[in-house]
Amino acid sequence: MSQGNSVRTLSGLQRLLEGGLIICCVLAAYILLALTSFSPSDPGWSQSHFQGDIKNWTGAVGAWIADILLYFFGVTAYIMPIIVASTGWLLFKRAHDLLEIDYFSVALRIIGFLLLILGFSALASMNANNIYEFSAGGVAGDVIGQAMLPYFNKLGTTLLLLCFLGSGFTLLTGISWLTVVEKIGFVSIWSFKQLKRLPQALKREHETEDTRGFMSVVDKFKERRDSQHVLDKAKARQPAETPSRVLHTRAIPEESHEEFITEASSGKGKLSSLVKILSFNSNKAKDEPKSQQRVEPQLDQASAVAEYGHFEAPPWVAKSHDAELDDVDTGLNAEFFEDDDGDEPVFHRETMIDEDDDTLSFNDDDVIDFDTKVSAGAVTQAQRQKQTPKAKIVDGIVVLPGQEDKPVPTKPMDPLPSVSLLDVPDRKKNPISPEELEQVARLVEAKLADFNIVATVVGVYPGPVITRFELELAPGIKASKISNLANDLARSLLAERVRVVEVIPGKSYVGLELPNKFRETVYMRDVLDCEAFSQSKSNLTMVLGQDISGEPVVVDLGKMPHLLVAGTTGSGKSVGVNVMITSLLYKSGPEDVRFIMIDPKMLELSVYEGIPHLLCEVVTDMKEAANALRWCVGEMERRYKLMSMMGVRNIKGYNAKIAEAKVNGEVIYDPMWKSSDSMEPEAPALDKLPSIVVVVDEFADMMMIVGKKVEELIARIAQKARAAGIHLILATQRPSVDVITGLIKANIPTRMAFQVSSRIDSRTILDQQGAETLLGMGDMLYLPPGTAVPNRVHGAFIDDHEVHRVVADWCARGKPQYIDEILNGVSEGEQVLLPGETAESDEEYDPLYDEAVAFVTETRRGSISSVQRKFKIGYNRAARIIEQMEMQGVVSAQGHNGNREVLAPPAPKHY
């Protein structure tokens, strides 16, 4: 069957829900018809006799239902159809929430519903007339009203019942009465304003209709003739050596006038309407011969600064400023023209064109006669200037009235960003109860017994994402037996994944970690508010998330001192890196911590561009990344020499010595300064050294492009940079042995593994299994330095817009001071080279290089073995000669089969 003829069928749950919706809607309509067509003579629950035909439209069953509802609830029974239909609709639309029922909220809604129904019934019973032969409030209303009247009288009972209604509404809907009052006030004020503007709008519309046909062909011809006459007169009077400023006024067609009035009266497009009134164009004067022109006298030097060019405005906008706001209500609020006090315009400039300026002197001939009725509001140019809001020039740019300048972000007063920049989390507590945990514990014991494993659950620790069950095994049962059954246990327990913790430090139990049915999100704001982060004195304090029991996990990068992060795509690795960087921004300023960020993907770390913590721009070119790592090696060596001369062991001791000298009023000069290195007559004073954090988002891409030299640079930094205050955070989504090599792992003991695809990847990053059983979305295994047992941590979540807020807050505090040598490289004499590495300029060609080139070009064979046999040299020497030929373009690079093509022609033979 073709795909076009196939019909998508519903699943079992969808069929049930859609069928339930249809049943509820039909039942609601049935009850409504039964109540509407109720007759007291029909058979019912409240009467036993029956004579004649049934008048109810829904038959005897409908008559019975209507009789019961009216008997018990009175007029409140007419609400029942709405309740039935709403229940069916909610169950149909929110079926995915059925499994996440908050029983406490459901109980509150039921209580609110009962308060509403019973309170309304009691009020109807006390104040409304009977309906048919039943009480207006039914039996329920009569019982409640008669029980309360002897104690509270009618007024007190009414107040209490109104209290029931208000409380029931809040409990049922969750809507605050303060919000209701606020919305009612807003609607009332808006309605009052609309009613106040209605007479003016009707008056304006009436005037527009009366004058719409006033413009005739003769008037248009007269207007065009007068405009040309004025233009000729102005040209004759204009001095040749000093061009005067021409102010252009362009006639707007009636369609534009009507469109503007329609749009303005509707209150929309305030800024666009204002631009229609005041639009500047300095390039259309020569292209519009039909436009009206008025030559103004030459301004003096002070007023000539405000050169406006050509001013275009509809000639029908001609009333005064007050008249425009009152009579021609264009929908523009006064805030576009005046400030909050309403006394002066928002925009000010001394060079603004003003009709009251003493430098402007008009002759009688300078005023254009606008006697022709271009439109209903056509008046003279001088009157139009009086009512038009003035424009200004800021830095050579014309700013229209109503176009407010973008607010310049003010520098925050606090030394560090506020936690209020992060969103307030919408916390949803885990609805699992102790009884359910007990049932799961018994189920775990039963499933283990199915595999002949006798174990007892001695502890249950529920967390935001997983729950750990601690098992006490029977004598003689190995923990590895449970580990081998992890997949079978996950299948039998209907769990996504099961992780077995064979060793729990300090306990003799085995841990079994099961994912929760409802997963909670760990928000960064919750973790930043903890005391462990706020009270930490280290400038390199970072937050990771929460552990399996919900406690925040706070670490110190200075004690790690380097971190290796790995995880597959979508496991939460990039979010984890952002959380660590943001927590450092919340803890330290640029005087304490500086960053070098390397982002081969050009997406993850570019958001931090512009923060004052950066030592250079975010590196996206991998050649510049190699230079940045070389600079770090050079800076590390410089700091080591400086600390050695200062007699301190690490950067902490160095900064303490500098701070102590400043407190005592002493100055410590740079002991490494040489007069030949600077133009200054004396050595500069030493200052505090910040810690440097190098963040590499995708380490595998950098190694693929730059090569193995990156591995050597990173290994050298990782070996020695701790005391110098330089720390590495390396992240990769390909945790293979060719990326995370043994040299890197040996020098970076701190690891962080997110979800990986196989056990091999887990062993590569952690040297043990476990990362393949993680749940993703920030679920990680954190291996602290000096330990062999990883801790399971649920990573904190921070959204992109929250990161943008923190970055904008730091950008408002200052600009970064970049060091150009980081990306461009250092001078040749100061180039940092690894052991055994030589600079390109220092490379010497082999003495046999010329002979080898002649041999290769003549024989057209560019293999290492041929050069080795010809000149009887070792393999390494022959390989270096071939590599030099490749660099010089003599031979090509190796192909897929290992062969090289000889590119250079043979040397010419001399006879």
From Swiss-Prot:
PROSITE patterns: FTSK
Spans through the membrane: 16-36, 64-84, 104-124, 131-151, 161-181
Cytoplasmic side: 182-911
Subcellular location(s) per record: Cell inner membrane
Domain FtsK: 550-763
UniProt xrefs under SMART domains: Ftsk_gamma
Chain residue ranges for the region called Disordered: 403-427
Protein origin, superkingdom: Bacteria
UniProt xrefs under Pfam families: FtsK_4TM, FtsK_alpha, FtsK_gamma, FtsK_SpoIIIE
Any GO molecular function: DNA binding
GO biological process: cell division; chromosome segregation
Comment text on domains: Consists of an N-terminal domain, which is sufficient for the localization to the septal ring and is required for cell division, followed by a linker domain, and a C-terminal domain, which forms the translocation motor involved in chromosome segregation. The C-terminal domain can be further subdivided into alpha, beta and gamma subdomains. The alpha and beta subdomains multimerise to produce a hexameric ring, contain the nucleotide binding motif and form the DNA pump.
Similarity field: Belongs to the FtsK/SpoIIIE/SftA family.
Stated role: Essential cell division protein that coordinates cell division and chromosome segregation. The N-terminus is involved in assembly of the cell-division machinery. The C-terminus functions as a DNA motor that moves dsDNA in an ATP-dependent manner towards the dif recombination site, which is located within the replication terminus region. Translocation stops specifically at Xer-dif sites, where FtsK interacts with the Xer recombinase, allowing activation of chromosome unlinking by recombination. FtsK orienting polar sequences (KOPS) guide the direction of DNA translocation.
Record note on quaternary structure: Homohexamer. Forms a ring that surrounds DNA.
Record-given protein name: DNA translocase FtsK
